Structure formats: C-alpha cells, structure tokens
Amino acid sequence: MQGSLPWGSFLDAGTGYNSLRWVSSLDTERWAAVTASAGMARTARKAAAERLRSQDRVLVANWTSPELLYGECFDTVLLDYFIGAIEGFAPYWQEQVLTRLRPHVKGRLYIVGTEPYVLDAPATEEGRIVQAIGRLRDACLLLGNGRPYREYPASWVLRQLGTAGFRVREVRRFPIRYRERFVNSQLEMCLKQLDQLNDPALAQALRDRIEAQRAEALPYARSEQGLACGADYVIAAEPLDPGHHALPLPQHVPVDHPPAPQEAAPSG
C-alpha cells in the first residue's frame, strides 16, 4: 500500500508494543508515538529499545487536548486499532478523531481495525465461540468498572474519512483465525476484573464460566483451522486537496431591487 513512497516523518497516534516495534524498524526521518497510558508508554519504549533516536518521542497525552502536537505535520500517520480503543480513554469521541487528526496528516494515513464481532449473529460454531469470549470479556470489564473497547466496521470508517476531508486510496481485508494466545489473553483479562467485585458468589460464578469458556475454545484454537471469525481491515487514505474541501458556491445573478418607498411629506 505504501509502495515507493518514503515513510518520512511518522506519527503513531495510538501506540502500543507491536505498532512501535514495527514503526521503529522503518526507515523514517523521525517518529512520534502517542498513548494515553503511562504504562503503555513504558512498554512502547521497551519495544523501540536501542532503535529510539534523539529525534524520536513517546508522548503520554490524550487527543482530546487541542494542544497535543499543535502545528506539527507528519508524512505518514498510523491508527493501529486506535478507533476501537478510544472508548476506554475518550468515550463518545470516535466521530471526532479523524477531524482532530486531519491537520497532522501531510501525506498518507493508515487505519487498522477489526470488524465488530460481539453484537452480530455468528454464522458458524467458531464465530459463536469468539463472540461468547468477547461478550464475557465485556461483561467482566463493565462489572469491574472498566470500559470495553468498541470496534467500528470499515464502512463506518470510510464514511467518516469523507466527512473529515480524506480521499480513500485502498482498502484491504484480512480474515482472522484466532489462536490460543487470543483465547487466554481475553479470558485472563476477565479474571483480573473479578478482584473488583464485592460479590464473592458472582465472582465465583464468573470464574467458573471463564474456565468453561476456555475449555470449549482451546481445542478449536489449537487446531489447524483455528477459530476462524471475522476480519481485520487496513485503509489507506490521504488528505483531499484544499480545492476539494467544499463545492464552489453557486453563482447568483444580481437582482435590482426597487427603490424603497419614500415617506410622504407632511401636509399643511
């Protein structure tokens, strides 16, 4: 999707271990990585390790702040599973994120996401299991006073890109086969939330359900086919030319208005 375009200056708008490990391996002039979590910032710095240069930055900040990276533009901007994660840090802000980032995109914008799988009716047994894991995870997060991620479909992102002033260059979809790591990581997240519950009976019931779900899912995840369910997508976009931001105003023919009536002179 990048082709022969240079990476130039690079912004990882919602960084994590995997994304920054990849970004720091690219031939960039400089990069900035933003996260709202201090813990994730430490993890990201470890991912960059010795490849962290003096011109590179890891920032702990929230994109709801208008001062963040004010006046800076980047040749390449990456949103790596970022829109789905916004709910945990800036709920109800998803529709504004692309407009917020638009001034920082000089060249190419890449958006990576997952098609939602928690709400839609699954068509296969593997899909049912993946959905059950997602619903159990979200239920435990809510009971533990957390906020579940909220994935958005590619169709929603494409509409928002147009509204925010971007032209879509390419869309690719990649079918997902979930493996053992996914099952265990999601269910371990569930277990961590149980410490927040004040109801021991409910916590034990959920713990039993978590382990039953693990026992059901792992044979599928360990098989050659894995848990085939849904797809990831990658969208490449770029800013519209300034002349394309709005349609030209219609040309109106001037109309001669009749003169205003004059007041009659007082008689007498």
Name each region found by the language model:
Residues R147-G165:
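Short alpha-helix
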Residues P175-A221:
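C-terminal helical/coil "lid" or tail adjacent to the Rossmann-like core of SAM-dependent
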